Each structure stands twice: as structure tokens, then as C-alpha cells.
Amino acid sequence: MTTHNFEHPLNEKTRIYLRVESLLRQAHTAASFSEPHQHQLFFRSIFDLIEIFEQIQLKSELAKDIEKQRLLYRSWLNVEGVDQATLRSLLDEADRTHAALMQAPRFGQSLKEDRFLSSIRQRFSLPGGSCCFDLPALHYWLNLPIERKIEDARQWLDSLKPLSDALNLWLKLAREAGHFRSQTALNGFFQSDAEEANILRLHIPMEYGVYPMISGHKNRFAIKFINFETGQACSQDVHFELAVCS
């Protein structure tokens, strides 16, 4: 059975984390520059990340979240019934990630100070603004050897490695905290309580031809399935898999 997978954040912090994860993934995928116009996706992702960093103290939020995990793991040390080898491995990873995060400069600072990136950032956001007559410096860079472009991209992305490592760890732990269970949306509607949840994860069979519209917060949520072809609320029962991740 073919399914499409969907994630929905239940608080603003997690919403930002998922957006940053998506932008980092896009930037890494496009950094090979193996296809025409991949530079568009790469630079747009980088500039979107810079804009988020300018608005939110992401480093301090992530540091607090990783620290909470470290304290939780330490409370489980020597507790009977807990796999101590796995626990110590997770604690070591959390310790390393937290230390690297605390030593890192403010996220995106080196990107903002990069002469080339700063020279193209403003015009890049204009509709069609990446034409050679708008951004001659970008046009020159695009004609550099592929090895040079890949190396530049690697250096820019490496400056975000402490962020990427911390974010990947927190999201991995959050996702693994939830377990998929079979659910049924009666007449295309489902609602439930959630205790301090961060993310909803859904596996929805494609055969229904629907996508979810989700509203809610960390303690309660509702899912309404919408028919893709009509844009109207689905009136049939939808069987799907749901994980509520705290």
C-alpha cells in the first residue's frame, strides 16, 4: 500500500525547527550543483536560514532543549530495566552535541559577514532578480569550476554544522518518542488529546486521495481530511497511522 507521510508541529518552537530542518536539507541537496538552476534552491535556502537566525535566538532554544535531554538521561543512569549501554551512548551523543553547540558562534553570523553572500542577498529575493545584469557577481561565480563552487558551499554549510547536529538530534529523539497506531477518521474527521506533544506524524494511504488539515496545540488536536481533487472536506472514513510525539 502506497502512503504519503505528513508531519505537523504542535507548538511554534517545533514549527521553526522543522522549517530549519527542511531548509538545511534543501541546501545540502542542492550543494552538488549537478543540475541547472540548483544554485537557485541553494542560495534561497541559505538566505531563508539567515532571515530566521536574525529573528530568533535559535542557539539558546536548542541548547535548552538538548540540556533537558541530558538531564533526563542522567536521571535514568543505573535505573533497573533501562538499557544502560544504549543510554550511555545517547548521553555521550547529547554531551558532545551540547558542547559543540555552546562553543559555536551565533548561527549564521559568518554567512552574514561573507562578502559574496552579502553582495547578492538583497537582489536575490527580487522576482527574477538573479539575472546576470542584476547580479553580475553571481553570474561570475556560476562560471567558476564546479570544484570551486562545491568547496564554497561546503564551507558555508560547515559553519552550520553545530546547528544541524543539535537539530537532528532533538528531532530524532522527538520523533522516536511517538509510536504509530492505527486510527480511523470517521467521516474524514479525527480529534484526540495529547500530553505535551511536539509533533504529529501521519501515514495516509494514497488510495483515499486526501490530505490532512490539522489544528491544535500541545494538549489537543483535530485532523480534517480534504479531498485533493475537489478541495472539499472528505465524507468517507479514512484509516491511517498516527504517532503523537512528545
Curated annotation (Swiss-Prot):
SUPFAM superfamilies: YacF-like (SSF160950)
UniProt keyword Cell division present: yes
InterPro entries, A to Z: ZapD, ZapD_C, ZapD_sf
Keyword field: Cell cycle, Cell division, Cytoplasm, Septation
Annotated compartments: Cytoplasm
One GO cellular component term: cytoplasm
BP-aspect Gene Ontology terms: division septum assembly; FtsZ-dependent cytokinesis
Source superkingdom: Bacteria
Keyword Transmembrane recorded: no
Subunit structure, as described in the record: Interacts with FtsZ.
Protein family: Belongs to the ZapD family.
Entry function: Cell division factor that enhances FtsZ-ring assembly. Directly interacts with FtsZ and promotes bundling of FtsZ protofilaments, with a reduction in FtsZ GTPase activity.
Name of this chain's protein: Cell division protein ZapD
Lineage, broadest ranks: Bacteria, Pseudomonadati, Pseudomonadota, Gammaproteobacteria, Vibrionales
